[in-house]
């Protein structure tokens, strides 16, 4: 949505990344000068939602205080849900060094909501060790009805590819369209509505440290994803009673509990642990204006840091519209073998390193040290292109989840009918040009 900040405020958003926000849906619902008064305004309950340890350094501490109609503990006991699609187990299929690519999956033919429509493609690590990630697709054709969800295993970075999605969370509402992303923190309860009837996209489930903006180094004080373009919702609440279901993801399994009211009953909240969205089209792309294609780290939107400086548990990178001005240079992303592992998706358009076969809604996986790069057609065009004039790449948006750990496919991904068995052939047309007598 190309809205001004005034319009975004009118639509119910607050600007900034990890700011200390304060918002109330009823006047005076936030206590003044304290977090947990003896009696909260309007007969509300005070509840703290902690996203980091109590003693985490202040610059990294994430928590919010919620003022709600009923505490989060009010529900019946959870029971295990038997299912085999939304997982955190990545040891059932030996990971392969082969390059892998999947065509876009078809939409479901039976009524399927957001949670039932999630299928796990790959991942590494796990929620018990609080490191690594799960990579999933979602395919849905029905809004969640009388059903709510939260993820205790990690925060969810959601990348819509087809269809608008409305995330109605306990901390407010976010309307998201393709080429925007949304991040739902660990533990935040929500339901998903589908304004367009169908929706498809990607999810990165982050088991590790919270996503943050990367340091800019010599880029300076501005660039890449600017903090003011991240939008957090204002408080909005539901006061509904009925026969509802609360679904939780906990240690790789889904659990369900009966709940007699909507858990989206937060009337006011303050803090810096909250859902947010970001429009990828606002990314300030940095590139070379002399020669050579820089490393893809210049396209970094969000990172989940590890304990090793310079190494992230997850990098979220995008490849959007941009100008290529490098002279006498191979302009597409170069051939590469990487210590890290790369899972890519395409939101819209054509990816500049692949002329065919990588369609919007599809995905690819290039694991540690697996060779990859432009296909034969792209190489042929790029090596004969006129580089004396700039080239404008338009109408495209691809992304990458990059991790230092090997990304291990699930049985679903390894045996999927959408797996392109002939993917390797896109490089077989790369011919020998070597001649020791001609430089």
Swiss-Prot record:
According to its UniProt entry, one GO biological process term is: L-phenylalanine catabolic process
| Binding locations of Fe cation | 336, 342, 372
GO MF term list: homogentisate 1,2-dioxygenase activity; iron ion binding
Q: What are the required cofactors? A: Fe cation
Entry EC number(s): 1.13.11.5
Catalytic activity field: homogentisate + O2 = 4-maleylacetoacetate + H(+)
- So, what pathway does this thing act in? Amino-acid degradation; L-phenylalanine degradation; acetoacetate and fumarate from L-phenylalanine: step 4/6
GO CC annotation: cytoplasm
Q: Report residues binding homogentisate.
A: 351, 372
Its annotated function is as follows: Involved in the catabolism of homogentisate (2,5-dihydroxyphenylacetate or 2,5-OH-PhAc), a central intermediate in the degradation of phenylalanine and tyrosine. Catalyzes the oxidative ring cleavage of the aromatic ring of homogentisate to yield maleylacetoacetate.
Assigned protein family = Belongs to the homogentisate dioxygenase family.
The family database entries (HAMAP family) matched by this protein are listed as: Homogentis_dioxygen
- Give the protein's recorded name: Homogentisate 1,2-dioxygenase
Which organism is the protein's source? Cupriavidus pinatubonensis (strain JMP 134 / LMG 1197)
């Amino acid at each position: 949505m190309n809205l001004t900040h005034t319009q975004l405020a009118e639509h119910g958003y607050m600007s900034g990344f990890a700011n200390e926000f304060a918002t109330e849906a009823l006047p005076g619902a936030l206590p003044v000068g304290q977090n947990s008064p003896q009696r909260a305004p309007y007969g509300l309950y005070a509840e703290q939602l902690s996203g980091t340890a109590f003693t985490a350094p202040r610059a990294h501490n994430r928590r919010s205080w919620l003022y709600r109609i009923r505490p989060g503990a009010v529900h019946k006991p959870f029971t295990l849900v038997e299912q085999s699609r939304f997982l955190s187990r990545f040891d059932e299929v030996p990971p392969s060094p082969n390059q892998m690519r999947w065509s876009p999956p078809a939409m479901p033919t039976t009524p399927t909501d957001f949670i039932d429509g999630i299928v796990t493609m790959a991942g590494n690590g796990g929620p018990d060790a609080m490191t690594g990630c799960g990579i999933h697709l979602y395919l849905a054709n029905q809004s969640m009805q009388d059903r709510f969800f939260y993820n205790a295993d990690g925060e969810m970075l959601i990348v819509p590819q087809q269809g608008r999605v409305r995330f109605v969370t306990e901390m407010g509402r976010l309307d998201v369209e393709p080429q925007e992303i949304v991040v739902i923190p660990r533990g935040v309860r929500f339901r998903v509505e589908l304004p367009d009837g169908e929706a498809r996209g990607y999810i990165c489930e982050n088991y590790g440290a919270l996503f943050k903006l990367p340091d800019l180094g010599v880029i300076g004080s501005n660039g890449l994803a600017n903090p003011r373009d991240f939008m957090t919702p204002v408080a909005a609440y539901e006061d509904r009673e009925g026969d509802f279901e609360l679904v939780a993801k906990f240690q790789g399994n889904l659990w369900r509990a009966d709940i007699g009211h909507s858990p989206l009953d937060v009337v006011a909240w303050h803090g810096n642990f909250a859902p947010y969205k970001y429009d990828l089209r606002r990314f300030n792309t940095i590139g070379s204006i002399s020669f050579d294609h820089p490393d893809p780290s210049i396209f970094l939107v969000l990172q989940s840091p590890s304990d090793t400086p310079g190494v992230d548990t997850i990098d979220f990178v995008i490849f959007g519209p941009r100008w290529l001005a490098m002279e006498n240079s191979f302009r597409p992303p170069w051939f590469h073998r990487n210590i890290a592992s790369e899972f890519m998706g395409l939101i819209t358009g054509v990816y500049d390193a692949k002329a065919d076969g990588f369609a919007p809604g599809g995905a690819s996986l290039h694991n540690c040290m697996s060779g990859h790069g432009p296909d034969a057609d792209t190489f042929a065009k790029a090596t004969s292109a006129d580089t004396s004039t700039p080239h404008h790449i338009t109408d495209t948006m691809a992304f990458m989840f990059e991790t230092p750990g090997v990304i291990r496919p699930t049985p679903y991904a390894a045996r999927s009918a959408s797996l392109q068995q002939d993917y390797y052939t896109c490089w077989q047309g790369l011919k020998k040009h070597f001649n020791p007598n001609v430089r």
